[in-house]
Structure formats: structure tokens, C-alpha cells
Amino acid sequence: MRIAIVLNTSWNIFNFRMNFVRHLLTLGYEVHTIAPYDDYTHLLEEAGCIHHNVRMDSRGANPLKDSALIAELFMIYRKVKPGIILHYTIKPNVYGTIAASLLRIPVVNNVCGLGTVFLKNDAISFVAMMLYKISFRFAKKVFFQNPDDLNLFLEKKLVSPAAVDLIPGSGIDLKRFTPTSFSRNEKFTFLLISRLITDKGILEYIEAVQKLKSEGIDARFQLLGAMDPRHKRGIKTEVIQSWINSGTVEYLGTTQDVRHFIQQADCIVLPSYREGTPRTLLEAASSSKPIIATNVPGCNHVVEDNYNGMLCRLKDADDLAEKMKQMQRLTDVQLLELGQNGRLKMEKEYDESIVINKYLQTLHDLTPAS
């Protein structure tokens, strides 16, 4: 059977869906990946996928470009003739579903997170909801990554209750992200891993760090992730450089493997505004690291306050700084317990096999009996 997997970047497929893709290939599925070409496309092809390039601007909303995207996806779908199409991220979910409906190809969508668009009551939010409502009536199944997003879509009647299901994000590979022996750093180390955009709480993190330093708190404050100044909520390069030059944070750049950086930190921080299920927190918890995250949808399902980490208030740098102080004051035994609890939570609730099995069951249910 031919399966199409559609995302906004090849990088996303390789980093978050590759074990699922390999599983499909092992089972004999013909897997077609559809995403813009990038540095990871050849890795998909080397794994056995048949790749199709698509022009997709994931950054903005341009009606003309988005209309062209529907047409382009329609042409690809008509050529490939997949039995089922799996969409991830906003534009494939919306425009890909519309294109597939014209060809009557069954679609499975994955709402990876709503970002901040649904937090506002403006024209953009209204248009986004209308697009979801129009497109999602054609989806056979819609997976959500946290119950808050699922309930929001049901309350606003954007999706049929019969079509929805819940999965723990993309899951986590428990064999890849494993704990190391506990060893507290001589200088307590906080690490935030994220693209450098405001929605991830970067500005609150920096403000909290500045507050802690002004109080004489002796710790290391690190930042790992790509600069993205072209993003509409990206932080300007010169601003980031000023943080580096002033010694506010240690900027670690980017990496293709975060495991070493997670392992050398004492605590992982993510004061994000809203998430689906943040991969960074799954990786941290699976590695038995204590976490500080915002008490918002997505984050507060991965982090249980005072069980495997601490929750701080949204957009509140003072509260974040207070939680960071509390974390640093914990004894080795308390830090170890938080980390171990996080690992147990991942094993029980977030093993990627849970996600893979739900998708396989859905594919089975949607496959016509021969």
C-alpha cells in the first residue's frame, strides 16, 4: 500500500517521524514523503522513501501562495495516488486535506500544536478557525497531542467527535534518550533548547537570568537553538548577540544531536506560551532531567508540578526566576527523584511505540478489505 507523509520540512520528518517511517517501510508500505527540499531530504531517500518536493512557505499566510499550494499538492496526490495521506503541521493539515478531498483520498491529520493563533480574538484567529472547520470535515481521523487542543476544537465545532483521538506527541525513543549516572555540576546549569522566537519564552528566560544574576545567584545559563530572525516572532540577531556579549547567557548554537547538551545540564527550562507536546521536554524527562516549564497546554501534561519538575506562570519572568532559585536549592536526592519520576512518566505515557501503534491501527481501519 502507498502512504504519503506531508510536512512543512524534510528536517521535521527525519527528526520527529523517522522511526515511524522506518516501521512502515519494514512492514512493506511504499512511503512517499512530500515536503520542501532541505539538507535532510537525501536522508529520507536513503532510508527508502520516495520524495516529492513542494513549495511551501511555513512562515507566513499569503492567500495567493496558499491557493497555489492546494493546486500543487493536488497535482502531486493525483500523480502518486496514495491509499492514505498523513498530514502534520498547519498548512498540510488545512490545504493538503482540501486537495485530498478533491481526489477522495482518505486523510489522517495530526494537530502538533496551535501556537498562539488561538489565544487571540482577531481576524487571523477567525480565518484560521474557518480554514480548520472547512478542511477537517474531510479528515477520517484527527490526532491531537494534548487534551486542551482536542477539547478546544470540539467546543468550537471544528472537527467531528467521531474523528478525534489523542496521542502523546510524536512519542519519545526511550532507547535513544537514556539517563546517565547522576552528577550535579559544580556550578548549577540551566539549559533552554528552542528556536529563538518569542513564543518559546526566550525573553522571559533572559529577563529571569538577568534578575538572578543581579541577586548574585551563581549558576550557568545556556541557550541552544537556531536563530530565526526572519520569523514574524523571531528575535533579532543583534539582540541575541548583545546577550552573548554581555555574558547574560552562553549561546551554544545549533546541533544535530541534543543528547550531550541535555546530559551536561542540571535542569531543562522551557517557558513556552503554548505547545502541542514539546519534544524538548520529552527528551529531557526521558534523560531523567528535572524540568521547569510553563503551566500551559502541552507543557503541563509533560511536567507535573513537584513530581518531575516545576511549573511557572505564563509570561512571568519573576515567577520563572523564583522557580529556578527553588530548583537550584534542591538537594541531590531531590533532583535525582525529580529526574527518575520524569523517566517513569515517559515509560508509562510517552513511549513512541504508543504513537506508532495508534497510527498502524488507523491505517488498518482505513484500508479497504481485499
Where are these regions (language model features)?
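A conserved mid-protein helix/loop that constitutes part of the nucleotide-sugar donor-binding site
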Residues: 15-19, 188, 192, 197-211, ...
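Donor nucleotide-sugar binding/catalytic pocket of nucleotide-sugar-dependent glycosyltransferases
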Residues: 52, 133, 137-179
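Short, structured helix-loop element that forms part of the nucleotide-activated donor/catalytic region
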Residues: 41-45, 215, 220-248, 252
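Conserved acidic donor-binding segment of nucleotide-sugar-dependent glycosyltransferases
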Residues: 305-306, 310-318, 326-332
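A short, well-ordered alpha-helix in the C-terminal region of glycosyltransferases
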Residues: 319, 326, 333-349, 355-361
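Short hydrophobic beta-strand element within catalytic cores of glycosyltransferases
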Residues: 290-293, 303
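Short His-centered aromatic/hydrophobic patch
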Residues: 87-93, 111
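Aromatic "clamp/platform" in nucleotide-sugar-dependent glycosyltransferases that forms part
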Residues: 254, 273
